[in-house]
Amino acid sequence: MAKVIGIDLGTTNSCIAIMDGKEPKVIENAEGARTTPSIVAISGDGERLVGQPAKRQAVTNPENTIFAVKRLIGRRYDDPVTEKDKKLVPYKIVKGDNGDAWVEAGGKKQSPSQISAMILQKMKETAEAYLGEKVEKAVITVPAYFNDAQRQATKDAGKIAGLEVLRIINEPTAAALAYGLDKKDGKTIAVYDLGGGTFDISVLEIGDGVFEVKSTNGDTFLGGEDFDMRLVEYLAAEFKKEQGIDLKNDKLALQRLKEAAEKAKIELSSTTQTEINLPFITADATGPKHLTLKLTRAKFESLVEDLVQRTIDPCKAALKDAGLKAGEIDEVVLVGGMTRMPKIQEIVKQFFGKEPHKGVNPDEVVALGAAIQAGVLQGDVKDVLLLDVTPLSLGIETLGGVFTRLIERNTTIPTKKSQVFSTAEDSQSAVTIRVFQGEREMAADNKALGQFDLVGIPPAPRGVPQIEVTFDIDANGIVNVSAKDKGTGKEHQIRIQASGGLSDADIEKMVKDAEANAETDKKRRAVVEARNQAEALVHSSEKSLKEYGDKVSEAERTAISDAIAALKTAAEGDDAADIEAKSQALAEASMKLGQAMYEASQKEAAEADAKADAAKDSDVVDADFEEIDEDDDKKKSA
């Protein structure tokens, strides 16, 4: 049976592993390295370079060297994050045919999935060279906080690379698999994963082959690239102060600054001071200019202090969702190259109150976990049960723009959930199902994933048709949505297509700001709910007044009409208390009408019973008569 490989498709570096007997093993690439830079370049003569060869020529070919493309995968071109990235990278980010953020290299527009596919192909070739056989199936890792669009785009990249992606697995979960495969005792662990472009925190219970994710949180635009860019900005500012030249306008100089920043960042993890020397960085009328600067670890830490702190809020949220305190975590596993930074280790120790576990290789552990998952799917690894979760709540927009959750965040996947909704208008023949992802109370404040129409609903009063909406999330975290008219059996199903990823601002809006905005959200939701109830009450009161108005006095009819008018006016405003008060007033004014309706229905019921009794009496005679006829018929037929 052909091997299934495990791939960690990283922002900065990628890694590949396989199961070698009962142990996962990292495979070295053609250059003899255990990780491969996630960089693709098109050289001057049109040659495609991937990995280390692409990185080596980046300084001389910055416009055609694509790096950190994972941060663009599944994102729209008009996304604020894309705008931010455009200012920081030397290559061109352009608008794709579908409105997504694409890149341009060698004069050709390509999607992030295509660039990622080139990196995956390099991984595939590495495995084939080692195994001596064709490789067609893989398990690929993604950040736990990747949304549906980003997961879809990653799966597409695998397909483009000629791989059947058997499973998309979350990076922290993969790391936990590698860490805990040989652990028999039950433990609660936190995986703190700060990589090149993304940050994830996952809380898991592991033991005796069961890996259950309790909660996950993160930031899809926070990683080593941001630390590098912060240092690039500092170096450029210092040079401008000294020489009066802005290096950020020079793409060649910018690429040299980036390389120097990355090197300095790595050096400062093991030393307290480093020197940056960039001779002939630029030139002006007075001659060539050189950049020479001493950088201390303390200075670097002060430059990135806010980035380090940004990892703490997701940690708090993950613990809260898991119902745990920091002291209840038995072990904190560090994943991702950035966790080698002493400041990161220090803040993790402060927050969790214990030394983080450093027994795993932060660059390789995710790929090792992916290989274990591949082994599980292939049947080579027995007695391992992995229970992962969906990172964000999923739901639809309902009357008044409310976000109605069908699947809450941190629900174990795969999962399926259905809920019955109805129409908002009389004789409504179609409904639009708008699918959202997020944590805010109003749909507009969340991320729109897609929409579709269910048509052909038979005309009926509002609230009568029954439309069943079903959300289905598979083990890859990819969403399917269907809507079915229970009356006609008509069904419409879609797999949510990649319509752009979640931006940094979007993520903050969804989760981090959710609590800060909880009060506002609560008020807005209360208004919408009060308004919906008011409209239903107005509708039923007007209908009742029309049918039974003649059963009450003129004064009572006027009082009900006035109460309806007052409630309609209140419903146009934003005061939930006022709407509720006017609703109560209408309910009280309509009590006489309700009494009249009840008396009328009782009278109708009594009349119906009397008719039924009379019919029963006459039926007795008819029955005797018919029975004789029946016997006659039988005799005739005999």
Swiss-Prot record:
Query: GO terms for molecular function, please?
Result: ATP binding; ATP-dependent protein folding chaperone; unfolded protein binding
Acidic residues compositional bias: what residue ranges? 620-632
User: Which top-rank group of organisms is this from?
Assistant: Bacteria
Q: PTM Phosphothreonine: at which residues?
A: T198
UniProt KW keywords: ATP-binding, Chaperone, Nucleotide-binding, Phosphoprotein, Stress response
State the family it belongs to: Belongs to the heat shock protein 70 family.
**What does the UniProt record say this protein does?**
Acts as a chaperone.
Instruction: Write the protein's name.
Output: Chaperone protein DnaK
**What high-level taxonomic lineage is stated for the organism?**
Bacteria, Pseudomonadati, Pseudomonadota, Alphaproteobacteria, Hyphomicrobiales
Gene that encodes the chain? dnaK
